[in-house]
Every structure is written in C-alpha cells, then in structure tokens.
C-alpha cells in the first residue's frame, strides 16, 4: 500500500506568521527520503496554506509524484493545465471550513464533474474524486469517467464509541469493495493518524492512503523524516 504525504500543514505553520519557514518543499523532499510514495498539496481558493510558488517548485524537484488537490473552479483548472501534475484530486471546498468536511457530491452535479474530469485528463493526469464511501457517489464517479476515487475517512476518524468506529470502518470496507468492483482505483484519507490508521491500512483493495496533519504534528517531536518513516512502517505492516 502506498503512502501519500500531505504537506499542507507545514505551509499552515509558515502562513501563521507570514515567514519563509518552515518550507513545505523541504518537508516534501524529506518525506520522499523517508519512504513517501507521493506528495499531496491542496491549493485552496483562499490560499490559507499552500501557495502557487510551492506547487511550481514541487513540480520541478519531486522525485516521486505530485497529487494536486483542487476545487472545481476555472482558476484551478487553468492552473492545473499549466503545471500538469501526475495526479489531480477534485475536492469540495468552502471558505468557512477548517478542513475539507465531506466528500464531493458527484451524483448531484455529474455534468459539471464529467466536464472537469475530461478536461483535466487531457493534461495526462490521473484524475480522482474525493467522495464519501457511498455507493451512489461511487457509481457516479465511474459514470463521469474518473479512473480513481479517494474515500473520505473523516467520519471514521471522528467516531468516538467502539460501535461508531466499527460502523464507520465497515462503511469504508464496503465502499472499497464496491469501488474496486466498479473498476476504480481506490485511495483513502482524511483524519488518519498513528492510532487509527492500521485498521484502514488492513483493508484489501486500497491503493494509497493520504495523510498529512498527524504527520506534521508528530514531526514536531521526532522530526519529519522519522514521522513519515514511522507511518509508512505502520501501513506496510498492516497491509501485508
């Protein structure tokens, strides 16, 4: 199973003071050295963390691949066509949210998402859709032509009781199986950390987990390379 390292919150720390440090590009290179299979960045409309310059630098220096998360806007479509990343993940986005709060409603806007997928696919990127583990959304993702999906694991991560955790984990398991059955590449992520990742990593059929905030937080105490290496080891062991 692959590990995609999201470096958004390295940039969050930088933007909090408007400084030049810490550098998310350095974090990305350290993550690659520690075993990351790819680097994920989300250029938000409000530019609260990652900036255009970060993305342009990463495109030039990454040894693995970039997974570019973006809202479905004309501004971001034009930017993605300019940088031509290896992977593009379409996500929902609102200015008020602290972080992405749910999956993209593909079923409710199929024509719009289909047009975006077709346009972005012409750049050569593998386009994925960040969605909830819901059969209706998974089927819609296939219909619009996306080759991949990323299942939102936030509800699992936020579950507090054993019953709720088990229920949300089953939702992910079922979603993965359904997605694979639809012929889709299935990734997953959001809210995963060192104490909840193993159950998700053990799910057969998941191609990649995208993890960020927990890695950045742990890196404050152990360093970024060690934080990434530790997460990678957990995922590899659980997915055997």
From Swiss-Prot:
1-deoxy-D-xylulose 5-phosphate binds at residues 8-9, 44, 49, 99. It is found in: Cytoplasm. Pathway: Cofactor biosynthesis; pyridoxine 5'-phosphate biosynthesis; pyridoxine 5'-phosphate from D-erythrose 4-phosphate: step 5/5. Its EC number is 2.6.99.2. One of its GO terms (biological process) is pyridoxine biosynthetic process. The keyword Transferase applies. 3-amino-2-oxopropyl phosphate binds at residues 6, 17, 191, 212-213. InterPro entries: Aldolase_TIM (IPR013785), PyrdxlP_synth_PdxJ (IPR004569), Pyridoxine-5'_phos_synth (IPR036130). GO terms for cellular component: cytosol. The active site is at 42 (proton acceptor), 69 (proton acceptor), 190 (proton donor). One of its GO terms (molecular function) is pyridoxine 5'-phosphate synthase activity. It catalyses: 3-amino-2-oxopropyl phosphate + 1-deoxy-D-xylulose 5-phosphate = pyridoxine 5'-phosphate + phosphate + 2 H2O + H(+). It holds the Pfam family PdxJ. Keywords: Cytoplasm, Pyridoxine biosynthesis, Transferase. Disulfide bonds: none annotated. The record marks 150 as: Transition state stabilizer. PANTHER family: PYRIDOXINE 5'-PHOSPHATE SYNTHASE. Catalyzes the complicated ring closure reaction between the two acyclic compounds 1-deoxy-D-xylulose-5-phosphate (DXP) and 3-amino-2-oxopropyl phosphate (1-amino-acetone-3-phosphate or AAP) to form pyridoxine 5'-phosphate (PNP) and inorganic phosphate. Belongs to the PNP synthase family. Homooctamer; tetramer of dimers. This is Pyridoxine 5'-phosphate synthase. It comes from Pseudomonas entomophila (strain L48).
